[in-house]
Structure formats: structure tokens, C-alpha cells
Design a protein with these regions (language model features):
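Catalytic cores of the polymerase beta-like nucleotidyltransferase superfamily
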Residues: 1-439
Length: 439
């Protein structure tokens, strides 16, 4: 989960305009960059998030560097990679965009679009993303280039689209705006908000995997609950929402899925990083949603299982619902959500969550980490149970007996296990479910 630094109230935006570029250049600390800025061609400029976040006083310790260069960027990236031992990833061959990956840094190089840097910036999505910092050349220092008045919008805490046409040039920009509003605590310019709402259906023209990547990035953001709630309210998510459409109060439910709420329930920072994104996605999407978004099978399963159990437990008002589940259903829940129990616990009251979390952290807890006390090979050998569905059912029965405390969790008494298994087989035989076994 991306946890940005708290904004600096004395940010660069409060400085006189003539001092801002120099202060930003100093803050960016180019000597720590993985490549020398002197190795870039004259006319190169830093753009994007590093400029924006630096101006806001939210710069990460190792920011992603996005550079516009007045030459073919792929060839330049390959040259720099050879001299710096970096890996090159071609992101867009037609537009000549490449990525350098080295020493934990990401440096994106893009060929300038248009005759000038200003023309390039005017093609972008939002004014706050259309600010560039030129690299020093000789005695000339760094200069801020802001043809779309992004500095004014940053200072005002406002998200403003450069133009309606720019948004439609890549409709994913509609959804990206929601993330920016949440991450940077911005308000949406009225006209821009109208464009986003009017053209929300255009988002279906974007490749599903790109939409999913933006949703995952939003869900993993510290303020992702706000971005998702906003996207929901603007109707951007309608084509992919779960078939059992989320409740009208989904935006309020998302507001409860915050890092502070997770910490209040005892989740560690690492647990929080894993639990919050899937909890947020599962509130809105089910397995079918993730299939339409071409998600991996693993993500389909995680989000789909959690969505199913949230619905089964009547949404976030779970409280005592877990205890009211029948044994077999409770076991199925624990099996389905074994790795994602912390995401479910975000919907519990604090004391319940803390108690359940303590049990989940114990890898030997028989309910929270259900496992059969023996294996199929042993049962086949001892009881002549053939491989197939019956053996699977028997193992599931023994798993349930152990999970519910009717078999020891630790000391696996093989004779007791054999007796339990034999009794189950005999009961099935009497019911006509299996042939009689010589036990």
C-alpha cells in the first residue's frame, strides 16, 4: 500500500514563483538519481508525479522519475542501460516510451510529443500533471514550465482536466482522476466533473487489464477508499460491479476501510498492506466482475471468495454472524479465506477482530488453518479406501473434526484418527452411500 508522506504545510508552492524551481530541484536531490542528468540530451525535462509531489511536499524517498526527451527515447534508454547496467522495458514502441529499471529505481523516458515541451504538456490529462521541470544546462538552472496553470490548481487543491478532448483521448484518464482526488485530497473542478460523468461509458473502450491495473492501484493506495467511493458515485464502475449490486451505502462502507480502522483492529503494517486492497475490491466486485476485467485466477478467487462470504454474513454488520454459522459452513469459510481472514476481520468489532486475528496468527490453530490430521495415502493403506471422491470426503470430515476440537490439534493419535475414519465409513455404508468395508 502506497503510504505517501504527509503534505508539507510549508511546501514549495508557498515560495515566491522565482524560487520554486530551484527549491524543487534541490528537493529532488539529483545526485542520488541512478543516472546522471548530465547524460540526458539538452531540452530534457522531468514531468509527472515527481514534479507534482515535490511541489506538494509529498515526495517519496525514491520517486519514480518520468522524463520527456527531444530524441527517440527507446534508443536513449538502451544506451543508458549499457552504461549503467540497467534493464530496459519498452512500454510503447510507436510513441517511443521506455523504462529503465536499476538499483530499485524506475526511470521512464518518453519522446516529446509536439514541437515544444509546452505542446507536449498540453496533451496531458490534468493540469496538475502538466507541469515540467527542465534540467539545468550549463549556467542555466532548472525552470518550471506550466502552460496549463497547474501550479494554481495545485495551490487551490483542485483537479482540473486540460480539455474534454484530452480525457477522451484515453478514457482511462476518467478513472485516474478519481485516484488523484483521493490521494491528494483534491476537489474536482465542476466542468471537469461534468465531463467525467457525461463520458463514463467511454471507460468500457479501455482494455480491461488497464482498467483493472488502475483499480488495483487505487485499492492499494492509502486513500483508496475515497477514490473508489468517488468512482462509484460518478458511475465509472457500473460496467464491472458485482451482479448482486453493492448496497447504496457502499461509499459509506468504503469509508470504513481505512488504514486507521485496520490498525485499530490490530493489523500489523504488513497485514494491512495485504488486507485493505482485497477488502475494498470485494465490497464492489465478485468473481464474474474480475473475469470481465481479465484478472488473474488468483485475484478472482481471493476477491470472489471474500465477496461471497461478506454477502453470506449480511455485509459488514457481521458481529455474531460467524458464530451462528453451521459447522460445515464455518469450516468452508475458513478454508476459502485462510490467507485473507484479516480482510474479513476489518468488518468485525474491534474486540472480535483482535481475538480472531490472534488465532489466525497461530499457524497451528486447527480452525483458522484447517488441515486433515492424516493424508490420503495413509487412509488408503489402513482402510482400503479407493482414490476418488469418497477419499476426499473422508479427509474433509477429519479436517472438520480436528478444526472443531474433536480430534487433537497437535498430537495426532493415529489410532483415534483410524477409529474416527472407520466410524464415518460405516455410517456412510449404513446410509447406502458406500459399500461395506472390512474394517
Amino acid at each position: 500500500m502506497h503510504m505517501p508522506p504527509d503534505p508539507d504545510l510549508n511546501s514549495i508552492l508557498t515560495l515566491p514563483p522565482g524560487d520554486q524551481a530551484g527549491a524543487l530541484w534541490q528537493l529532488l536531490d539529483p545526485p542520488q538519481w541512478p543516472i546522471r542528468f548530465q547524460d540526458l540530451p539538452q531540452g530534457s525535462a522531468l514531468v509527472g508525479g515527481a514534479v507534482r509531489d515535490g511541489l506538494l511536499g509529498r515526495l517519496a524517498a525514491r520517486p519514480d522519475l518520468d522524463l520527456v526527451v527531444p530524441v527517440e527515447a527507446i534508443g536513449l534508454a538502451q544506451t543508458l542501460a549499457r552504461s549503467h547496467g540497467a534493464r530496459v522495458v519498452v512500454l510503447d514502441r510507436d510513441r517511443s516510451i521506455a523504462r529503465l529499471v536499476l538499483r530499485g529505481w524506475t526511470v521512464d523516458l518518453a519522446r516529446q510529443e509536439g514541437a515544444t515541451l509546452a505542446a507536449d504538456l498540453q496533451r496531458r490529462d490534468y493540469s496538475i500533471n502538466a507541469i515540467a521541470l527542465t534540467l539545468p544546462q550549463g549556467r542555466a538552472g532548472a525552470v518550471l514550465v506550466d502552460p496549463c496553470q497547474g501550479l494554481q490548481d495545485l495551490a487551490a487543491g483542485r483537479l482540473r482536466a486540460i480539455s474534454e478532448a484530452n480525457l477522451l483521448d484515453d478514457p482511462l484518464r476518467l478513472l485516474r482522476g478519481m485516484r488523484l482526488v483521493g490521494d491528494l485530497a483534491l476537489s474536482i473542478d465542476r466542468q471537469s466533473g461534468g465531463w467525467i460523468r457525461d463520458h463514463r461509458a467511454r471507460l468500457t473502450q479501455v482494455a480491461p487489464e488497464r482498467v483493472l491495473a488502475e483499480l488495483e492501484r487505487m485499492a492499494a493506495s492509502c486513500s483508496g477508499h475515497q477514490g473508489l467511493a468517488l468512482a462509484l458515485n460518478y458511475g465509472l464502475l457500473e460496467p464491472w460491479l458485482a451482479g448482486d449490486a453493492p448496497p447504496q451505502s457502499a461509499d459509506l462502507l468504503l469509508e470504513a476501510l481505512t488504514p486507521a480502522q485496520a490498525q485499530a483492529r490490530g493489523l500489523s503494517p504488513d497485514e494491512l498492506l495485504t488486507a485493505l486492497p482485497v477488502a475494498r475490491l470485494a465490497l464492489l466486485f465478485d468473481t464474474a466482475s474480475l473475469v470481465r476485467l481479465q484478472a488473474s485466477r488468483r485475484l478472482q478467487k481471493r476477491v470472489g471468495n471474500l465477496h461471497h462470504w461478506l454477502k453470506r454474513l449480511q455485509g459488514p454488520e457481521i458481529r455474531g454472524a460467524l458464530e451462528r454459522l453451521a459447522e460445515d459452513e464455518r469450516l468452508n469459510l475458513q478454508i476459502d479465506l485462510e490467507t485473507d481472514i484479516p480482510a474479513l476481520l476489518l468488518h468485525l468489532e474491534r474486540r472480535q477482530a483482535e481475538t480472531a486475528l490472534e488465532r489466525w496468527r497461530d499457524p497451528d490453530d486447527p480452525l483458522f488453518h484447517p488441515a486433515a490430521p492424516t493424508d490420503g495415502h495413509t487412509l488408503q493403506k489402513q482402510l482400503q479406501v479407493p482414490a476418488g471422491p469418497l477419499l476426499g470426503q473422508l479427509l474433509h470430515y477429519l479436517k472438520q473434526e480436528r478444526a472443531m476440537g474433536r480430534l487433537p490439534a497437535q498430537n495426532h493419535d493415529q489410532e483415534l484418527i483410524r477409529t474416527k475414519a472407520a466410524g464415518w465409513l460405516q455410517a456412510r455404508a449404513r446410509e447406502g452411500g458406500v459399500i461395506n468395508y472390512l474394517l
